[in-house]
Amino acid sequence: DECSAKVLAHLYSELPAPVFQLRPREAAMIKYADNAFHAVKVSFANEIGRFCKATNVDSRIVMDVFIQDTKLNLSPYYLKPGFAFGGSCLPKDLRAVSHRAKQLDVSLPMMNAVIESNQEHIRHALEMVREYGRKRIGVLGLSFKADTDDLRESPMVSLIEQLIGKGYEVKIYDTNVTLPRLMGANKEFIEREVPHIAKLMCLSVKELLEKTDVVVVGNRGKEYESIFREHRNGHRIIDLSGIGEAKDLNLDEVKYEGICW
């Protein structure tokens, strides 16, 4: 209750740390998340160490430099629940380490499980769509992050491919993706994974809404926030990116569900 919260806040007020007032279930889960993450960090460092030793690399030097990066490596970055990772770097480099470790007979169970965990997250998104029982699915955001046209190993492309394979009618809009402009490996990837993508693309959010019943938001492109104002009654919105966190959006008027919230 509010009175107890004030008493506890006063007791801890001298400590150089913020005080959060939460429900007991979130407070308890934070402890589990803390300790699970610490265990993951220990296991990660040890797996890097085993791999480094097998390749004649000094893991102490590697990790001493690794921890200097407080923008990405040791930071809040990548630590918010959302959709699966993708792009031209993370999947490729993780597979490279895993492949080389197998050649050297070095066991890296945690890193080997990361790709499968990522695929499971894509399957989870597919199951969320399936549970609505609608066949006309719109996808906002084809690339793995906002403000890029890089489609290589985008988890959204994988999700779309699986939806099409299961007979869903898919429409796509991405403000950054113009098919005639795609080049090289990027163009080859999307044409291989979704051969008829040109027929699926819409020219605007409005057009996509007119042709679909369920909308999946794949990245946090600013333009996609308009779905919370322009949606038709009955639209379901599945948020994979956290775009619904924007302060000026009214989620009370839409049928909205986040992938992890």
Give the ranges of each region predicted by the language model.
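Structural/interface elements that position substrates and couple domains in central-metabolism enzymes
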Residues: 1-261
